[in-house]
Amino acid sequence: MKITRRTVLRLTGAAAASLALSSCSASGSAILGSNFSSWLQQTLGISSSGAASSAASSEDMAASSLAASEQPAASLAALPAYDADPLTGEAKRSNGRIVGVMVNNISNTSRQNARPQRGLSSADLLIECKVEGGITRFCAVFHDADSIPEIGPLRSGRDQFLQLLMPYQALYYHDGESAPCTKFISVYNYSGLNIGGKSYFNTPTHPHVAHRDSRGRNVAYEHTEFTSGKEIRQAAANAGIGLSHDYDTTFFRFADYRTGEENAMQGAASGRTVSITHSDHYKTSFRYDPQSRTYKMQMYSRISGKFENTVDELNAKQLSFDNLLVCFAPIERYSGDSGDVQQVSYISGGDAYYFSRGAVQHGRWEKASPEHPLLVYDKTGAQMLFNRGKTYLAIVDDDEWSNFSYQ
């Protein structure tokens, strides 16, 4: 049997995820390491020293890259200490805890329709990935609870979003969750808020932390739930979860706000229009607006059969982003799942495309474990330099690479 790189990525990714869910305990990472190493030896004939060396070098690279990005250059010694907003790279606005809210994106029929959503234009980071049945879902990420307006419709949690938030101890806010997501939360003892999983939130002592609004439309009940920063604060207080956190790192490596540094994308290919296919009926596109220096978002609507502006219902504004990051990864159905819950093999890494200022840089991304951050590297092997501002992050199936385009 011929073993290609893609086969190896899928096999190792699936094995690692399975071990993470079934074998981890209080000594989680150690168990994962020993089991994964032995599995590699048996399956691919890799020596234990080789596997250990590879794992160690990967961890060393991540550690050194993070350390380098967090340490100011000697020439910056006279400047104030670097204290950036973890999601945008701008000067820090608060010491609040990052909050990620799961938002519905279904648009199949007039009754099964969550669009237009509310509150997405206020998110500092918007993550999109398919979850099941080809449908994508959003995780709207905010630098603190106080910055969250009314947002929704809410939907259930998925581990592919949770894993991106875990390294930052973000509050993960959702209604319901998949079985793999439940396992991740249990295995890693993660503090989140599944408001659909705690019946006491509906008692007089702990009032509702979300509200319903059909918006005068004949939509299914599951597409009518909304929340807000105020309600999230109440839910966190009810559960005894703190909403303060002093971050000393950022989600991406951002250009330094203290010096006005910028990634001018010199020598990069043109990237003024971007077309992303998540599945047959869930497609996202962007067009660069040179006046605002942002990318304007559109999504394909199965109902209308055409692309439509992605608009925040609260303010009628089209969603726009300073940065786009498209990461390709092996995605497939969880083995043994009775439905179509999707598993992202983060341990495999993959191609990354960073768009900003109307241009694109091609690189690689990696994520060593659920507790390690997503790291993005350019072609030289250095961490990709992001311009400050809002970012759209797409996690896209490798199988859709041929349908991805930009110009």
Question: Where is each model-derived feature located?
Answer:
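A surface/extracellular/periplasmic glyco- and lipid-processing/surface-interacting theme
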Residues: E70-A123, E132-Q407
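Bacterial lipoprotein signal-peptidase II cleavage site
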Residues: S25-G33, L40, A51
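Extracellular mucin-like PTS domains
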Residues: S48-S49, S53-S54, S58, S64-S69
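N-terminal secretory signal peptides and thylakoid transit peptides that target proteins
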Residues: M1-S23
